[in-house]
A protein has these predicted regions:
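Substrate-binding cleft of secreted/luminal carbohydrate-active enzymes
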Residues: 105-124, 130-203
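Polysaccharide-binding and catalytic clefts of secreted carbohydrate-active enzymes
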Residues: 1-104, 116-117
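Alpha-helical scaffolding within the catalytic cores
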Residues: 63-65, 85-100, 122-136, 171-175
Length: 203
């Protein structure tokens, strides 16, 4: 946590920035060996929490520490996180309690889930996934959109959705239109703008 907090402090102190945004990487695996010694020390000192809750606490404390560090230097600089769009995955696999952060003060100013799916995705269709976040997040909500998928086959979208970004050229623009009508959504991010550079067919 100290290494991360100090890195953020260096950026906020030395650069004229508007915001710090973390990507969706937290615990890299469920493997118990990666923090075996830290968890053993915790248990030996009387800790009662499961490994899963221990990890979530570590991430929560890191997020809260980063937020506090930023605000102590420049209160106008915002802090947000762009997590994976699957809330259950965030909580159970990478130990990121995104709902806690988005519902309680002192963690983030905004949340920006990576809803990198088309409307026909069989696992996480865009509209339903967006609604889930609207129903759960109470902080400022942005949505990250999948410009990089334009013109590409989506192997993990199921049979009905795998060719959606090839056949339909206006998916991202329709997503922007849809988001603009939702009171809970404050805006959107594009991943990534490099997808606009050399592809005239990009939607």
């Amino acid at each position: 946590t100290d290494l991360i907090v100090n890195g953020v402090k260096e950026i906020v102190l030395n650069y004229d920035i508007d915001s710090i945004c973390f990507d969706d990487y937290f615990y890299p695996t469920k493997d118990k060996n990666i923090d075996k010694s830290a968890y053993k020390s915790y248990k030996d000192s009387g800790g009662k929490k499961s490994l899963q809750d221990f990890r979530r606490d570590n991430i929560n404390n890191m997020v809260k520490s980063v937020y506090s560090a930023i605000k102590s230097i420049k209160s106008n600089v915002t802090f947000g996180i762009s997590p994976a769009s699957n809330i259950d995955y965030d909580y159970s696999t990478i130990y990121a309690d995104v709902i806690k952060w988005s519902r309680n003060e002192g963690y983030v100013d905004y949340i920006c889930p990576q809803i990198y799916f088309g409307f026909k995705n069989e696992n996480q269709p865009f509209m339903q996934t967006t609604k889930l976040w609207c129903d759960n997040a109470t902080c400022k909500l942005y949505v990250a959109l999948p410009m990089y998928k334009s013109g590409q086959k989506d192997e993990f979208a199921g049979e009905s959705g795998k060719n959606e970004f090839i056949k339909e050229k206006d998916i991202v623009s329709r997503q922007v239109t849809y988001l603009s009508k939702l009171e809970q959504v404050s805006g959107f991010y594009i991943f990534s703008y490099t997808s606009l550079k050399d592809n005239e067919e990009t939607s």
